[in-house]
Each structure stands twice: as C-alpha cells, then as structure tokens.
C-alpha cells in the first residue's frame, strides 16, 4: 500500500486506482488464485477510494499516517465483507476487531514509509510536484 498511497499523493486518484488494480492482478498471476484476486481487488478499491477522500478532503485533520490507517482499515473491512458475502456467513465479521488492530499498526508504518518516500521524491524530483 506504500506505492498506492505515494501514487495518490504524487499523481492523483486515477493513477492510485490503476496501481491498486495492477497490484491485485499481479497477486492473482503469482498465486494463480482467482479468489485471492476477488478479495484483493475489493479491498484495494475501497482502500484507494478512502485514502483519496481522506487525503484530498481531510488533510487538515489527517496526516499521511492517518490516511494510511484509514486505507488499511478500509481494506480489511472490504475483504471481510466480501468473504462474508461469498461464504454466506456473517460470523466472519468476528475477525474484524483483530484485523482492525493489525490495520492500525500496518497503516502506521505504511504511512511513515510513505512520508519518507514522498519527502525524498520532493527533494530529488521536484519537477514532478510542480505540475
């Protein structure tokens, strides 16, 4: 998700969404699992949408760490929702609190890494940010 968040910040929503879709497609090709693609693509799309909204419209409230946490939590929620629908079992939502806790930690570190990368991109490739 580092690459997705950096793509959203540097290039915008459409490119972030393309990177998300590409990430899910590569996962499917590597694992050979269509079911992993289904879970991944729904998580990636919701995560990308939520990160964009948080970054674009709530950047005074949320830092990139907060934006990343929103993305991680959204990704987990989407995957659990799809699993619940596919398996026709709402008990799967009982995993959500644990996954949300993990999402807080992973989102925090993804946000930190994204801040570092964007700071270095701005320093070394300032012309990208001048458009």
What function would you assign to each model-found segment?
Residues 94-131:
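Alpha-helical transmembrane segments and their cytosolic interface
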Residues 1-15, 50-55:
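Generic transmembrane alpha-helix motif of multi-pass integral membrane proteins
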Residues 22-53, 64, 87-91, 96:
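Interfacial aromatic-anchored transmembrane helix boundaries in multi-pass membrane proteins
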Residues 56-73:
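Internal alpha-helical transmembrane segments of multi-pass membrane proteins
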Residues 4-5, 54, 80-87:
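Generic transmembrane alpha-helix signature in multi-pass membrane proteins
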């Amino acid at each position: 998700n580092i690459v997705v968040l950096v793509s959203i910040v540097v290039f915008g929503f459409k490119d972030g969404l393309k990177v998300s879709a590409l990430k899910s497609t590569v996962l499917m090709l590597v694992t050979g699992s269509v079911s992993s693609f289904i879970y991944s693509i729904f998580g990636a799309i919701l995560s990308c949408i939520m990160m964009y909204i948080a970054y674009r419209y709530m950047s005074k409230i949320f830092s990139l760490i907060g934006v990343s946490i929103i993305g991680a939590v959204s990704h987990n929620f989407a995957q659990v929702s799809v699993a619940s629908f596919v398996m026709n079992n709402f008990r799967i939502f009982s995993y959500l609190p644990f996954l949300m806790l993990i999402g807080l930690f992973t989102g925090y570190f993804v946000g930190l890494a994204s801040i570092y990368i964007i700071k270095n991109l701005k320093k070394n490739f300032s012309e990208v940010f001048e458009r």
